[in-house]
Amino acid sequence: HRDLHSFPTRRSSDLDQVDGHGNVRHFSKIVCMHEEDYGILWKHTDVGADHSEIRRSRRLVVSSFFTIGNYDYGLFWYLYLDGTIEFEAKLTGTLYLRAIHEGEETQYGALVAPGVNGMIHEHYFNIRLDMSVDGDDNTVVEVEAKRIPTGPENPYGNAHTPVETIINSEIDAARDIAPQNGRFWKIINRSRTNTLGWHAGYKLMPGPNIKPMHQPDSPFMRRAGFVNHDLWVTAYDPDQLHAPGQYVSQNEGGPGLPEWILENRPLVDTDVVLWHTIGVLHLPRPEDFPVMPVEYVGFTLKPVGFFERNPTLDLA
């Protein structure tokens, strides 16, 4: 096993964690909270009136850093003035290294210093999002753009339209990103409607991602089957807290998202949980040695129909 270590920060809250032996450890000043400037919130220039308006953006940052083995992981949540919520993982620390003879093949790694081979590897995060958008009765909708064939309705060949598909049950809810179609997922409350007719909602906008490089019969894939899909949706269950099941490092596979969705519970107008998988393939480079600059991955939650207009218009 590998124990998880956290280190104090300023302006922070305490946290209890379970170590590799199952004991509760109390850490002081672990979860950091601060506000920071974030450039431009919105801007427009009215050319005819020769007038510009601009507002500064600020965000509340809730963060913590953890050390697991040779890696250091920062988990950052950003809360923006317009209702946007962003998650960002910061990956740093040191590479997993092995000694290498001069001229030896580096097939499974990369030469990062004389006699030092940095091993190729992957990282996976699964973020459990217990959504309650204006209440617990939520529905997940997959949205992507569809191109319209050139013809009478599209004479210039530049038209496209959104296509929405309700995710009705758990087996249908193992989904993957499709950046070529701008795919995202809305979580809406169909009993809450604004004056424009929009259901109150938030949309999950994925960032860059990868598919697992492991073979399907590998021990890793048996234990971590959740990496097979970028998004899973399940009905809320208080006992389902971790995507690979309760004891990922001590089992030979089985419990976890691939098994849970076989219940095929309905997902429309109910309490839903989204599980977003994020993967990073790390091909080491000399610049990663001896300590790695931060690599960033994450996703964004944006309000869609939750407000009736830009909620930051009253900022001075």
Predicted region positions:
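Extended effector regions of multi-domain proteins
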Residues: 2, 6, 10-84, 90, ...
